[in-house]
Amino acid sequence: MADIMHVFAREILDSRGNPTVEAEVFLDDGSHGVAGVPSGASTGVHEAHELRDGGERYLGKGVLNAVNNVNEEIADAIAGAEADDQRLIDQAMIALDGTENKSRLGANAILGVSIAVAKAAAESAGLPLYRYIGGPNAHVLPVPMMNIVNGGAHADSGVDVQEFMIAPIGAESFSEALRMGAEVYHSLKSVIKSKGLSTGLGDEGGFAPSVESTKAALDLIVEAIEKAGFKPGADIALALDVASSEFYKDGKYHFEGGEHTAEEMAKVYEQLIAEYPIVSIEDPLQEDDWEGYTALTAAIGDKVQIVGDDFFVTNPARLKEGIEKKAANALLVKVNQIGTLTETFDAVDLAHRNGYRTMMSHRSGETEDTTIADLAVALGCGQIKTGAPARSERVAKYNQLLRIEQQLDDAAVYAGRSAFPRFQG
């Protein structure tokens, strides 16, 4: 395998107009990899540290310090390393940083290099990224969890739930699933317009109408599914990202005008899954409510996927604790929450070995980088959420999955309804 010859980073803009890190790695055989690092709006307190410059430039959100850390310390530390030694390279960067949460060099600096190394190594090996990482058996295309109504921290719609997603579980292939999702998305626009509501978009390409409640938003989506000619629950299921830490204050959940306990929120979710074909609920409780998650999983975990995002932050140590406590039953996978590819691999492997499902995920601040599409297939996640079928930084990932499905040809398998516990057994 070729050796790393040169490592370089620059400051670019993400989809929200904020700076982020782009890293490039060049190998001595001429191979090259480039990676753009995403950034979240609603971030868990346990996430790896995203290094920002502060000051007046870019309203304090510049990343020149992270860029300099790549161009100086990290570049020197990994120069000459064999590019296929991903784990050794990631470990070297973690050791160089020397902090528990990558706060000295910045997870955004380390992750950019980690991904760029893998891309360069894949090019050197003459393999697509999903095949280089996942090996010859990587063949499952994920269910696209399309965020078509944006709320919470992703929009100014007034609704507390952050994401309302559709999951085309009845499709026979990824390409058919993408078509179904796009048709419902356009149908939803006409439904929203017919009710005199705004068709403005949130950060992730979903509509952000001002609706009075979670149920009102779900009713719009169900109407759109039916208008597009599909059957809710059979063809297309629903999913929520509640991001409840965003409205948890002073020991209570400030949800839809009331103050609720974890037990009361559990009853809200039980009612929702009884009334709507919901297959997945993400971050239903505050990120450190271990007891609440255990109780909620015992109550409804056999009926619905309970996904830990801020709860697990793609961290193997937190996931291990969740497994021991039987808290949640699925892991949201965000590479920038943990900061290296190999730590991400470890988290996904731990989840799968313990019967937890996994959903690969973008962030609300994205770039045109399509790495997560390849990772979803490589790691056998079975689900991916990367926004609405709109805005090029979202669609880029879906289009990459179309390419992968075409490359796999008859070997491609679409995860479909088998990805969710509601349809098991």
Swiss-Prot record:
Reaction(s) catalysed by this chain's protein? (2R)-2-phosphoglycerate = phosphoenolpyruvate + H2O
User: Can you quote a single GO CC term?
Assistant: phosphopyruvate hydratase complex
UniProt-listed CDD domains:
enolase
Keyword Transmembrane helix set for record: no
Keyword ATP-binding (UniProt): no
SUPFAM superfamilies for the chain: Enolase C-terminal domain-like, Enolase N-terminal domain-like
The record's listing under Pfam families reads: Enolase_C, Enolase_N
| Family matches, as InterPro entries | Enolase, Enolase-like_C_sf, Enolase-like_N, Enolase_C, Enolase_CS, Enolase_N
Functional pathway: Carbohydrate degradation; glycolysis; pyruvate from D-glyceraldehyde 3-phosphate: step 4/5
Q: Where in the cell is it found?
A: Cytoplasm; Secreted; Cell surface
Its EC number is 4.2.1.11
| Cofactor field | Mg(2+)
Q: How is the cofactor bound?
A: Binds a second Mg(2+) ion via substrate during catalysis.
Biological function: Catalyzes the reversible conversion of 2-phosphoglycerate (2-PG) into phosphoenolpyruvate (PEP). It is essential for the degradation of carbohydrates via glycolysis.
Q: Which NCBIfam families match?
A: eno (TIGR01060)
Q: This protein is called what?
A: Enolase
Q: Which organism is it from?
A: Corynebacterium diphtheriae (strain ATCC 700971 / NCTC 13129 / Biotype gravis)
Q: What is the lineage of its organism?
A: Bacteria, Bacillati, Actinomycetota, Actinomycetes, Mycobacteriales
The encoding gene: eno
